[in-house]
Amino acid sequence: MSTSFPELDLENFEYDDSAEACYLGDIVAFGTIFLSVFYALVFTFGLVGNLLVVLALTNSRKPKSITDIYLLNLALSDLLFVATLPFWTHYLISHEGLHNAMCKLTTAFFFIGFFGGIFFITVISIDRYLAIVLAANSMNNRTVQHGVTISLGVWAAAILVASPQFMFTKRKDNECLGDYPEVLQEMWPVLRNSEVNILGFALPLLIMSFCYFRIIQTLFSCKNRKKARAVRLILLVVFAFFLFWTPYNIMIFLETLKFYNFFPSCDMKRDLRLALSVTETVAFSHCCLNPFIYAFAGEKFRRYLGHLYRKCLAVLCGHPVHTGFSPESQRSRQDSILSSFTHYTSEGDGSLLL
């Protein structure tokens, strides 16, 4: 999915009317091996981590909160994203590539999961802003019903925003590439990359930064011994998003400039191709980190993992399982790393994972 985000261009040469052919065969070969191994790792860790989040949320007997709804949809977005990686791995190592239908579907699911995950991260930051900074005004609006409605809207937005990324994708000469109409040949790839840079990075980062800055201001204005841990977690959320996605988006922007011949030399094109593959690995692994940032940090979720482990062990050993997991029976807001996020809101707002 490197080059022309995230089309997989397996050509060994890059041609320019005003220059000699630039050999990229060694870069392509390295990228094939490197990305194949990486996709397998991200698929494994992303699948396990996000499935645990889904299991924790769906098996809880505690009433759901609006935060639970968003966390569930974030995990589902990441699962949709990682589910496409085995198909991209097959595409990388196979000479036959993907069939036309699989090419279009895999690209569609990839981008819907990609934008959906980033949009839900943004929605979670807005929800935290409403719960803490505007607690009194937003209490009645932060219901499960509102969460479901907003989540459906986010999925619709993700599909709408993702559609330009896959609407022209098809199998062509054993490659899964964008086959654009002649009038869009030069414009559409630039629009695709710009959409990723703006809607998939710059705007979400701006919203998150504003929301968490105001949250930190509010936390510092209140006396709470858990304040420092809450602030550290907020900084971790923003820093992780910035650290994982910034290098890749810079490379996407430079890839866009390449359409305007900003990088005429072959060495620069080779470096850009290599850097795009490497930064892609960093960016895509963010979906493996989401469960740790938004869920695993919660004391209740760790208790659920312990319960799940004991339950599986009992089943494997043939022992009956006597108790079910009920976070409500182990309720302890102050024991949760994220408790300060909801401590200023109503008691009914607590998430299973927070």
From Swiss-Prot:
GO terms (BP aspect): adaptive immune response; antifungal innate immune response; brain development; cell adhesion; cellular response to lipopolysaccharide; central nervous system maturation; cerebral cortex cell migration; cytokine-mediated signaling pathway
How this protein is processed and modified after translation, per its record?
This protein is not N-glycosylated which is unusual for G-protein-coupled receptors.
Cellular component, GO, one term: plasma membrane
Q: Which residues lie on this side of the membrane: Cytoplasmic?
A: 61-70, 127-143, 217-232, 299-354
State the InterPro entries in the record: CCR1-9-like (IPR050119), Chemokine_CX3CR1 (IPR005387), GPCR_Rhodpsn (IPR000276), GPCR_Rhodpsn_7TM (IPR017452)
Which GO molecular function entries does the Swiss-Prot or TrEMBL record give? C-X3-C chemokine binding; C-X3-C chemokine receptor activity; CX3C chemokine receptor binding; cytokine receptor activity; G protein-coupled receptor activity
Q: Ranges in the Extracellular compartment?
A: 1-32, 92-104, 169-196, 258-274
* Keyword hit for Nuclease: no
Where does the entry say this protein is expressed, by tissue? Specifically expressed in subsets of leukocytes: expressed in monocytes, subsets of T-cells and natural killer (NK) cells in the circulation, dendritic cells, as well as in microglia in the central nervous system (CNS). Expression level subdivides blood monocytes into two major functional subsets; CD14(+)CD16(-)-CX3CR1(low) inflammatory monocytes and CD14(low)CD16(+)CX3CR1(high) homeostatic monocytes. Expressed in myeloid-derived mucosal dendritic cells, which populate the entire lamina propria of the small intestine.
User: Which key words are in the record?
Assistant: Adaptive immunity, Cell membrane, Disulfide bond, G-protein coupled receptor, Immunity, Inflammatory response, Innate immunity, Membrane, Phosphoprotein, Receptor, Transducer, Transmembrane, Transmembrane helix
Membrane protein topology class: Multi-pass membrane protein
Q: How does it assemble?
A: Found in a ternary complex with CX3CL1 and ITGAV:ITGB3 or ITGA4:ITGB1.
State the function annotated in the UniProt record: Receptor for the C-X3-C chemokine fractalkine (CX3CL1) present on many early leukocyte cells; CX3CR1-CX3CL1 signaling exerts distinct functions in different tissue compartments, such as immune response, inflammation, cell adhesion and chemotaxis. CX3CR1-CX3CL1 signaling mediates cell migratory functions. Responsible for the recruitment of natural killer (NK) cells to inflamed tissues. Acts as a regulator of inflammation process leading to atherogenesis by mediating macrophage and monocyte recruitment to inflamed atherosclerotic plaques, promoting cell survival.
Task: State the PANTHER family in the record.
Answer: CELL ADHESION MOLECULE, CX3C CHEMOKINE RECEPTOR 1
**What protein does this entry describe?**
CX3C chemokine receptor 1
Source organism lineage? Answer: Eukaryota, Metazoa, Chordata, Craniata, Vertebrata
